């Protein structure tokens, strides 16, 4: 989360499943919807989730007790159907996902880099 705040990134893209074929592929780095979790000096709130067929969209709020206090909204786009060691069977799903990411990035005033 330090890198996210340092680079002032507001959009995160995740293209892996958490578990595939019974194997952990990614450690969940965010709390469940409506909950907060501390990551070192940062507190992350998972404020909202919207689940779609191929992806999940989340809105996080990251804060840090500092002088001045830090608070930032982060948009997390999680593509859930990209197979390990393969490519998605439906290119339309990938294109829709990319469109959503681009629209989100364009809608932000100073979005910083997209973190993938």
UniProtKB/Swiss-Prot annotation:
UniProt keyword list: Hydrolase, Protein phosphatase
One BP annotation, GO: mitotic cell cycle
Enzyme Commission number(s) from the entry: 3.1.3.48
Domain Tyrosine-protein phosphatase: from-to ranges: 1-116
A single Gene Ontology CC term: cytoplasm
Residues reported to bind substrate: 84
Catalytic reactions of this protein: O-phospho-L-tyrosyl-[protein] + H2O = L-tyrosyl-[protein] + phosphate
GO molecular function: non-membrane spanning protein tyrosine phosphatase activity; phosphotyrosine residue binding
UniProt xrefs under Pfam families: Y_phosphatase (PF00102)
Family: Belongs to the protein-tyrosine phosphatase family.
UniProt name for this protein: Tyrosine-protein phosphatase 14
Gene name tied to this protein: STY-14
């Amino acid at each position: 989360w330090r890198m996210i705040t340092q680079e002032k990134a507001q959009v995160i893209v995740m293209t892996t499943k958490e578990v595939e074929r019974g194997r952990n592929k990614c450690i969940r780095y965010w709390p469940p919807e409506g909950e907060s979790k501390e990551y070192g000096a940062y507190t992350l709130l998972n404020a909202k989730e919207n689940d779609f067929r191929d992806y999940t969209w989340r809105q996080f709020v990251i804060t840090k007790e500092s002088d001045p206090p830090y608070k930032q909204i982060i948009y997390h786009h999680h593509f859930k159907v990209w197979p390990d060691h393969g490519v998605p069977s439906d290119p339309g799903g990938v294109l829709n996902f990319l469109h959503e990411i681009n629209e989100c990035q364009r809608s932000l005033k100073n979005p910083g880099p997209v973190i993938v």
